[in-house]
A protein has these predicted regions:
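Adenine nucleotide-associated cytosolic modules
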Residues: 1-127
Length: 127
């Protein structure tokens, strides 16, 4: 059982008030491990929402760097991030939204040579 801090109670109060979530559900969320494949058009907003919800661990796999052309649709990256690996840019924003979230980054492609080793550590995969 997690002993929620006052800050966590306030942060997650809307979840905790929901009959279908409550304290037990928020605890499950905070213990969950989710892998996001790609920090681009889908992975960017998904990562932000997962962090805001309090997912305990978010893994991000992406072998790309932020390009200026990404910024109009990949909301996790900012102009200052151009040239930075997307996983590092995403990690910074996730930690800014919710410092309690653990972020695991994989600056590589997810393919047959590494997929099983990476995904076995996670409860859910978003691709």
């Amino acid at each position: 059982m997690i002993d929620f801090t006052e800050e966590q109670i306030q942060r997650y109060s809307r979840h905790i008030l929901l009959q279908d979530v409550g304290v037990e559900g928020q605890e499950k969320i905070m213990n969950a491990r989710v892998l996001v494949v790609g920090a681009g058009g889908l992975g960017a907003p998904v990562s932000l929402y997962l962090a805001a919800a309090g997912i305990g661990t978010i893994g991000i796999v992406d072998a790309d760097v932020v390009d200026l052309s990404n910024l109009q649709r990949q909301v996790i990256h900012f102009t200052k991030d151009v040239g930075v690996p997307k996983v590092k840019s995403a990690e910074e924003k996730i930690k800014a939204i919710n410092p309690d979230v653990k972020v695991e980054t994989y600056y590589e492609f997810l393919d047959s040579s590494n997929a099983l080793d990476i995904i076995k550590e996670y409860d859910f995969i978003v691709d």
